[in-house]
């Protein structure tokens, strides 16, 4: 007899069923025609509590409304498992009716928490996230037909460019570690847990591999975004691929990273900040990443020499130089009055006691490379700390000028305070002279990079190192002339031109500005343009400022 309703097969396919037994659709398809589904009345479903509900394990509760629990089926269907490499686990949940309730609850519990909460995420899920992000990165990279070479070759090129053009100004990474991280970009490499003796007990075993993957992809994004295409030979769009991979991987272990930060936590965020600045020219996202790094440095109390010690001498050294680079950036922002500082002597308990150089003697440069000989690293760090002192001295002087001006105005003692014999005025003048004298400390290898002093050094090595010092010289001198103009403008704005040796005549102010600009242009003579171009938005912004303020 004809069936009274559509068969199960037609209902699933949502096609018209003629009600026969077997129906025409099933006959044509050659499949059994069955009617096992129990029809229910249409209308809102009424939830019925099972008789054994008291004995069932409770599912996770909704945070916003604790009166309602999350349905297992809804949760499994709403989670985008393909983004976390969980297809097999979901199939096991749906395809195995004998799966125990406790194992189902355990699986759902892992999905109910954000993937960055590594404390409640199993090692297999962390590994799945790693493999998924890497697979997507390699796929997007290979889809760009214009690229030459594979992804590992590109990463090696980025490390080479960083060490020659940007490491002299931002020596915040360990070259052997960067190069050892490159194989993680290959789909043929399996992330291995850190050996037990080197494992931080506070983090899962795979976290060090995730940190290194995030670090090398952040470096590639940073380099390709900042250096000209004539150097990187890669379109700028490639930097976005690496940045998304780095950002996605950081999210995968972010909770652990924020709870137990290390030197990579700072370096990665600084390179993310640089990428945002160089690709958009906007400071919002860039400032956010930089601020995160500063907050982590403050929480670790890296300003205190007693807090810098780590079991690994390399880690201690990386934390030290990362802090000083953040400090330099903060002082530069203070001088430009672009935002309030996060790292400052006035808000650090006991002041900043961190030494420029500690007892760590681990080289950052790869000693196996011939171009790194002849004390290249020690010379680079000398110039780095000189630039830091320039920014810090200028920032303090600008703050003191503004504070002094506000003090004399509030006390109506302007005539007396501007007396040449006033102690505070004399102190400001002395600090200005101290700042201008810093340019005399620029070493000979930075002042004249092409004049190699060691005849035993190979010509190829000398050329490589000269490029390093040209890049550093460009940065140091740009900072120096920018700070001179900022100090001059601050004195003019606060009615204290005497600090820089000028009268109250606006003509003398304009003449001094032109003099500083001319000195800067003269100083740039002979500088390889590629060294200026490779500094990215920072150098361009400094040069733009020198043009605008005049």
Residue ranges and their predicted role:
Residues 237-260, 295-305, 352-366, 389-403, ...:
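Long, amphipathic alpha-helical regulatory blocks in the mid-to-C-terminal portion
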Residues 138-264, 270-282, 375-378, 447-452, ...:
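C-terminal transcriptional activation/regulatory domains of eukaryotic transcription factors
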Residues 44, 51-117, 139, 375, ...:
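C-terminal, low-complexity intrinsically disordered regions in eukaryotic proteins
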Residues 215-216, 220, 264-265, 269, ...:
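TPR repeat positional signature
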Residues 178-209, 258-273, 282, 290, ...:
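Intrinsically disordered, low-complexity acidic/Ser/Thr-rich segments used as protein-protein interaction/activation
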Residues 21, 27-38, 61-169, 222, ...:
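Intrinsically disordered, low-complexity activation-like regions
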């Amino acid at each position: 007899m004809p069936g009274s309703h559509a068969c199960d097969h037609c209902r699933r396919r949502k096609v018209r069923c003629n009600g026969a037994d077997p129906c025409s659709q099933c006959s044509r398809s050659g499949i059994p025609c069955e009617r096992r589904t129990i029809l229910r009345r249409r209308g809102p479903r009424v939830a019925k509590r099972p008789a054994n509900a008291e004995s069932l394990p409770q599912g996770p509760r909704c945070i916003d409304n604790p009166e309602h629990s999350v349905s297992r089926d809804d949760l499994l269907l709403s989670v985008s498992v393909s983004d976390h490499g969980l297809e097999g686990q979901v199939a096991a949940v749906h395809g195995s009716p004998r799966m125990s309730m406790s194992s189902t609850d355990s699986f759902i519990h892992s999905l109910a928490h954000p993937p960055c909460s590594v404390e409640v995420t199993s090692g297999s899920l962390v590994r799945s996230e790693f493999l998924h992000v890497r697979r997507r990165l390699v796929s997007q990279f290979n889809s760009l037909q214009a690229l030459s070479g594979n992804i590992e070759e590109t990463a090696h090129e980025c490390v080479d460019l960083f060490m020659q053009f940007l490491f002299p100004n931002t020596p915040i990474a360990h070259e052997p570690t960067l190069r050892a991280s490159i194989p993680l970009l290959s789909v043929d490499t399996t992330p291995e847990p850190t050996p037990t003796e080197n494992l931080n007990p506070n983090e899962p075993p795979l976290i060090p591999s995730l940190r290194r993957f995030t670090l090398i992809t952040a470096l590639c994004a940073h380099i390709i975004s900042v250096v000209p295409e004539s150097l990187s030979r890669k379109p700028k769009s490639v930097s976005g691929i690496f940045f998304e991979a780095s950002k996605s991987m950081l999210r995968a272990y972010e909770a652990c990273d924020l709870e137990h930060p290390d030197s990579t936590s700072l370096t990665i965020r600084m390179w993310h900040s640089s990428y945002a600045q160089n690709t958009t020219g906007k400071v919002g996202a860039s400032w956010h990443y930089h601020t995160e790094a500063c907050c982590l440095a403050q929480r670790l109390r890296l300003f205190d020499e007693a807090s810098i010690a780590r079991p690994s001498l390399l880690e201690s050294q990386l934390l030290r130089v990362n802090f000083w680079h953040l400090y330099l950036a903060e002082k530069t922002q203070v001088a430009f009055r672009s935002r309030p500082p996060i790292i400052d002597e006035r808000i650090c308990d006991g002041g900043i006691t961190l030494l420029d150089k500690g007892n760590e003697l681990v080289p950052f440069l790869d000693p196996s490379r011939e171009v790194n000989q002849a004390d290249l690293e020690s010379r680079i760090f000398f110039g780095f700390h000189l630039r830091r002192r320039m920014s810090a001295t200028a920032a303090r002087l600008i703050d003191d000028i503004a504070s002094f001006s506000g003090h004399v105005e509030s006390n109506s003692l302007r005539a007396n305070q501007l007396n040449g014999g006033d102690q505070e005025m004399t102190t400001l003048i002395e600090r200005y002279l101290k700042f201008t004298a810093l340019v005399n400390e620029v070493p000979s290898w930075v002042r004249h990079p092409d004049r190699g002093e060691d005849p035993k050094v190979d010509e190829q090595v000398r050329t490589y190192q000269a490029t390093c010092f040209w890049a550093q010289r460009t940065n140091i001198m740009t900072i120096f002339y920018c700070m001179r103009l900022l100090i001059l403008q601050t004195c003019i704005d606060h009615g204290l031109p005497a600090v820089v040796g000028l009268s109250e005549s606006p003509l003398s102010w304009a003449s001094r500005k032109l003099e500083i600009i001319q000195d800067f242009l003269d100083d740039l003579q002979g500088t390889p343009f590629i060294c200026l171009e490779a500094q990215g938005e920072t150098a361009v912004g400094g040069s733009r400022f020198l043009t605008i303020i005049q």
